[in-house]
Amino acid sequence: MASSRVDTINLRIWLVSIICAALSFINVTVHLIAINFPNLGFPCAYFEINDLKAVNLSANNEIYQMTHQLYINPVQIICYVLIMAILFLLIIIYYIVCCAKVFSSNKTSNVNQTTRDITWMGDTSSCFQFILIMDTFQLFVTALSFRLVALGAFAYSIFFVCFTTFNVTLITQFQSADKSFFAFQKIHPNLKGTVQFKTVVINLSELMLGYSTMFLGITTCLGVGNSIYIRSITVAFSSINTFLVMACIYSIVIEAVLVRYVKPLFGYYVGMFCGAVGLSFPILQYETFFESEWSTGLIINLSVVAIISIGFIICRLVRYLVKKKRRYKQLLNAESSSLMDENE
């Protein structure tokens, strides 16, 4: 049976959105590579936003100087940008593979089956959300290169919102593995492999979302700390507490709602733990530089985040392994129900 007109239109729009996402990925990749080299139009190295070794407090105490707050070190920033670029590449490959599989199996006897497959894999809206993620991430890195920390914090906030929306869209369009295997074995056996692929993509994306939650806290507080007069230690505590509150909210939403769609959803908790561990190294450097008596409190707050993340990992693992058995009761017929009514 030939594809319906609705399937044809949706398939063409989906193909155009994937092409746009691929072009955006090429643009962002070239930008992220070029920004690492001097004399290419970028004034500063984006990863040296908080170089504590080059600070001289006796000489750089003017009002127009950037205040050095708690932030991750250059190696961590470079690794974060690199891993995000790899994640972008993996998502592009996922969309291309899904598009190829749909084109190779679009002959079906079911009306609008292609539209349902596209919706399950990642429709046009998720593609454009992915484009917004890449563009806002590019803007964030560019703002760091120009030392515009307030603009960088604003750009990263938009990036984080788009990243969250993209993850929720992918997860909520996902059926359970049993239903997906059953549907694809009966209708489209060629699409069965996308179940595992999408699960991997979702967990890797959630892992980076968990780490980005930590990055959101320190980047937002870095922008606030350089926009208003506020103590550096207050900014440091605010960064960790923002990370803690946001991570707890996201973890509760995952366990309460999103696990109904994807059971093996461990990525966010692993990213949350990696964020807590990654932030511990800058705190030790922060203590050495400022000789702050508050470093113990910072470590305690960060340890709470790590413990909570481990607790959520154990909770998700237990809920994933323990299968609830439904007990089926025999339906009551008319006679038995009348006897029960008489007894009552």
Swiss-Prot record:
Q: Which UniProt keywords apply?
A: Disulfide bond, Glycoprotein, Host endosome, Host Golgi apparatus, Host membrane, Host nucleus, Membrane, Transmembrane, Transmembrane helix, Viral envelope protein, Virion
Q: How does it sit in the membrane?
A: Multi-pass membrane protein
In this UniProt entry, which residues form the Intravirion topological domain(s)? 1-12, 98-125, 169-203, 260-263, 315-344
Which Pfam families would you find in this protein's record?
Herpes_glycop (PF01528)
InterPro entries referenced in this protein's UniProt entry, alphabetically = Herpes_glycop_M
Virion surface topological intervals: 34-76, 147, 225-238, 285-293
TM spans (from-to): 13-33, 77-97, 126-146, 148-168, 204-224, 239-259, 264-284, 294-314
Reply yes or no: does the keyword Hydrolase apply. Answer: no
| Localisation | Virion membrane; Host Golgi apparatus, Host trans-Golgi network; Host endosome membrane; Host nucleus inner membrane
Query: What cellular component terms from Gene Ontology apply here?
Result: host cell endosome membrane; host cell Golgi apparatus; host cell nuclear inner membrane; membrane; viral envelope; virion membrane
What function does the entry list?
Envelope glycoprotein important for virion assembly and egress. Plays a role in the correct incorporation of gH-gL into virion membrane. Directs the glycoprotein N (gN) to the host trans-Golgi network.
Q: Per its record, how is this protein called by name? A: Envelope glycoprotein M
Q: Which organism is it from?
A: Human herpesvirus 6B (strain Z29) (HHV-6 variant B)
